[in-house]
Amino acid sequence: FVPIWM
């Protein structure tokens, strides 16, 4: 999972 801010 990759956070939106990354």
UniProtKB/Swiss-Prot annotation:
Instruction: Write out the annotated subcellular location.
Output: Secreted
User: How is this protein annotated for GO cellular component?
Assistant: extracellular region
Which residues are annotated as modified residue Methionine amide in the UniProt record? 6
Q: In which tissues is it expressed?
A: Expressed by the skin glands.
GO terms, biological process: defense response
Q: Which UniProt keywords apply?
A: Amidation, Amphibian defense peptide, Secreted
The identity of this protein, by name, is Electrin-1
The organism that produces this protein has a lineage beginning with: Eukaryota, Metazoa, Chordata, Craniata, Vertebrata
